[in-house]
């Protein structure tokens, strides 16, 4: 019981941070639709609140089957183009054209764009039962407007398990053929996390899954320094995954390198921590001091 409590405490700490100052709301695992791998309640809430005119067109087209009709169209587009494309370009279900995400305008002067940006709904859902075949659950799934963007498997060294166990769990116990875990069409990144280190992958591939460190580095070495948060890895949820940051990553930093001849060789590139940090510091410096210095 003590071990279980320590694991749950770690999970709750992440949830609390994202809910309290990360710009998220709490998702309900019962709203997760295993057939389509989306949070249908938040998906339709986002569409209706942010684009009522386009939603009305969908209702006129599909009638009483509007939700099912749109889910089928969404499924096809995600299968064909992928999650990153859908976030950036939206869904056309003629005559309706729906944005699935609104990115932050370059200037706060555009009040309409800013208002739409604020309509985004980021949510954190714990213990998501994702499979139609079994009752396996993932510790944490993050959603943007009901669409899954990231998973987290958490371990606490205080229980005798580390980030290596989280990686092993992804490789051995998480079937990449499951829709939520499928490359390109659903989650964009998967994090293996403990209280000391973070590792990531954009493509689950069984025992061949390749993880990259997502650590800050510690005095020129590997790992993470002691920070201001509760854990050495608190920067992940206190900084990287907070609302503005995650939406910015989806908009500007993730890159899908497709191999049309051999799709299995396609690669999703998610920035390492230091890459993200350097680019953002450079951009902030330009905004503050201008170019040409």
Language-model regions, residue ranges each:
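ATP-dependent helicase/translocase motor core
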Residues: 2-293
């Amino acid at each position: 019981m003590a071990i279980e409590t320590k694991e749950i405490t770690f999970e709750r700490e992440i949830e609390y941070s994202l809910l309290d100052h990360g710009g998220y709301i709490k998702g309900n695992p019962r709203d997760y639709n295993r057939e389509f791998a989306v949070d249908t309640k938040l998906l339709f809430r986002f569409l209706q609140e942010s684009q009522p005119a386009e939603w009305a067109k969908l209702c006129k087209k599909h009638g009483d089957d509007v939700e099912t009709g749109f889910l089928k169209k969404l499924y096809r587009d995600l299968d064909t183009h992928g999650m990153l494309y859908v976030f950036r370009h939206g869904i056309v279900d003629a005559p309706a054209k729906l944005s699935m995400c609104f990115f932050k305008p370059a200037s706060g002067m555009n009040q309409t764009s800013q208002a739409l940006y604020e309509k985004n709904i980021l949510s954190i859902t714990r213990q998501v039962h994702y499979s139609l075949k079994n009752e396996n659950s993932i510790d944490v799934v993050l959603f943007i407007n009901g669409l899954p963007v990231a998973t987290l498997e958490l371990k606490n060294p205080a229980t005798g398990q580390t980030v290596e166990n989280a990686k092993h769990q992804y490789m051995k116990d998480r079937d990449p053929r499951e829709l939520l875990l499928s490359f390109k069409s659903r989650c964009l990144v998967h994090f293996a996390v403990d209280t000391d280190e973070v590792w990531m992958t954009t493509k689950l591939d069984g025992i061949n899954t390749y993880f990259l460190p997502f650590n800050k580095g510690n005095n020129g070495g590997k790992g993470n320094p002691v920070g201001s948060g509760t854990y050495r890895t608190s920067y992940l949820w206190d900084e990287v995954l907070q609302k503005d940051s995650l939406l910015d990553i989806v908009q500007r930093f993730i890159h899908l390198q497709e191999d049309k001849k051999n799709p299995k060789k396609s690669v999703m590139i998610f920035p390492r921590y230091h890459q993200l940090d350097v680019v953002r510091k450079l951009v902030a410096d330009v905004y503050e001091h201008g170019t040409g210095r």
